[in-house]
């Protein structure tokens, strides 16, 4: 009953909360803007007005990008935690984000003239590579693995991929070009790239929501999922496909952003419970709002300079990660 009430509260208030977070993101930055200027630019855009140019070509794409990326990473984390029954699973910890960034680095060396859609496809391939490496290494452990052990494998794999990317960037002198994907500065959001990525975000989120009830069954354990007639392998493959689409799109659009997929699903689970038909939509909403507000905070930490968004999410995420390890030890979800 308590979780259903929170679900209603989140769903009912979400349009207002999203609108407020977007408005704040548009208003504040290196140059503060008034609400009058913002609404005037929305109603009657003046190409000769500098403030209108800032709003349409910088602030709106940045706010919309933060909302979409936060939603995508939160949903990805919720799916990974459900299908692995691992409370530490998230794209940044399980090597998915670093796999994407690694392949993008490789393609920048080998195929420097790649188009935006090609970079998106390479990012998907990299996300899949990262996931295969981590879960493949974990499957080789003779006595199985605990959530903490899987997180360690994921972290080591991520460090390896990140180190290889750094080595290539130094050797081939593309460090400046590569800094975008490893610093994740949302103020460099490309409006055209955002339009290209938006359908992929939509597809990934629709897939996740359509799988939500089946993921709930899988998260309850093998015996229960079998008794409910669920095809566990098919569900896991489809869920990971959704994760690859969402995470790959997020990394291609804005670079690596850590811990959103860890923190937001846990907060959402605390509020709405472990039913993924509620958890995934609510994680989507809260993830978008969370990253939009983190991006807003990144503008004031070292004002008037920008702080990389991953610094803000890590300040929140690292203590939360350590708290989960201390509180739950090696136990599995469910």
Curated annotation (Swiss-Prot):
Keywords attached to this Swiss-Prot or TrEMBL record, sorted alphabetically, are: Cell membrane, Ion transport, Iron, Iron transport, Membrane, Transmembrane, Transmembrane helix, Transport
What Gene Ontology cellular component terms go with this record? membrane raft; plasma membrane
Q: Which GO terms describe its biological process?
A: monoatomic ion transport; siderophore-dependent iron import into cell
Cellular location of this protein?
Answer: Cell membrane; Membrane raft
Task: Report the main location listed first in the record.
Answer: membrane
Q: Which GO terms describe its molecular function?
A: transmembrane transporter activity
Q: Which InterPro entries match?
A: ABC_BtuC-like, ABC_transptr_permease_BtuC
The UniProt entry lists membrane topology as: Multi-pass membrane protein
Gene3D superfamilies (alphabetical): ABC transporter involved in vitamin B12 uptake, BtuC (1.10.3470.10)
* Residue ranges of the TM segments: 9-29, 63-83, 91-111, 119-139, 150-170, 191-211, 243-263, 281-301, 305-325
As for family, the record states: Belongs to the binding-protein-dependent transport system permease family. FecCD subfamily.
- Subunit note: The complex is composed of one ATP-binding protein (YusV), two transmembrane proteins (FeuB and FeuC) and a solute-binding protein (FeuA).
Query: Its function?
Result: Involved in the uptake of iron. Probably responsible for the translocation of the substrate across the membrane.
Its protein name is Iron-uptake system permease protein FeuB
Protein's organism: Bacillus subtilis (strain 168)
